[in-house]
Design a protein with these regions (language model features):
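Non-catalytic regulatory appendages
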Residues: 27-208
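Bacterial N-terminal signal peptides
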Residues: 13-23
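Bacterial N-terminal signal peptides that target proteins for export
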Residues: 2-15
Length: 208
């Protein structure tokens, strides 16, 4: 099973500015990213992406499925890097914040960051081709995610999870009822999915 909290830890704890403009001097060299997807996609072999449901998207609040035509915009497939690249990024982030480091506050441009800390291009192509084959439109490919959109029917077919209406404290929401699934061949390169629901995070001490 995939551990989403581990593999997207940088997205959760590192300021966006540091992920977009990460430390590097002109002399830093990075090895090409190792491919993670090594098997052909077999739709009969699936794995679940745990931790990808909202706690209030439960049977008590369930009000039934949305129409298949319901638009699902700006979903994001979160990508994972090989462990050696994660370690390299950890090291760079430590140096950028260390005043004693000769690389203190030396930055990569967004394009350089994408080149150094993205999946192998072959893996990204495999993932985006699979999304397109399921009828989705790919909007943006970032270093750590693929932004895409489609319909609730396409989500149910591709990810084996249905999008339902949920009434929570007088407000209607939409969300996936169960954890999504992906072909097992893609699992080494995928950490999770964001934005399959419209629940907004509450501030600390706010309503939960």
């Amino acid at each position: 099973m995939l551990d989403q909290s581990t593999h997207i830890r940088h997205l959760a704890v590192v300021p966006l500015s540091l992920l977009v403009l990460v430390l590097a001097s002109a002399q830093v060299r990075s090895e090409p990213t190792r491919r993670l997807i090594t098997q052909a996609i077999d739709e009969s072999k699936r794995v679940e992406l745990p931790g990808n449901t909202h706690p209030e998207a439960n049977t008590e609040n369930d009000r039934g499925m949305v129409p298949d035509s319901f638009p699902m915009e700006h979903m994001q497939l979160q990508l994972r890097l090989p462990m050696e690249k994660e370690d390299e990024l950890d090291n760079l982030l430590q140096k950028i914040q260390d005043p004693s480091s000769p690389n203190y506050h030396k930055w990569l441009t967004p394009e350089e960051f994408k080149q150094q800390f993205s999946l192998a291009s072959e893996d990204i192509e495999t993932i985006t081709n699979w999304l397109k084959s399921e009828g989705f439109t790919v909007n943006v490919i970032n270093a750590r995610s693929v932004d895409f959109w489609g319909t609730a029917g396409q989500v149910r077919s591709a990810f084996r999870t249905a999008i339902h209406y949920f009434d929570v404290r007088g407000v209607r929401h939409i969300a996936n009822l169960s954890n999504p699934q992906i072909p097992a061949a893609l699992a080494p390169a995928v950490a999770g999915i964001v934005s399959m629901n419209d629940f907004k995070p509450h501030p600390i001490g706010g309503v939960r």
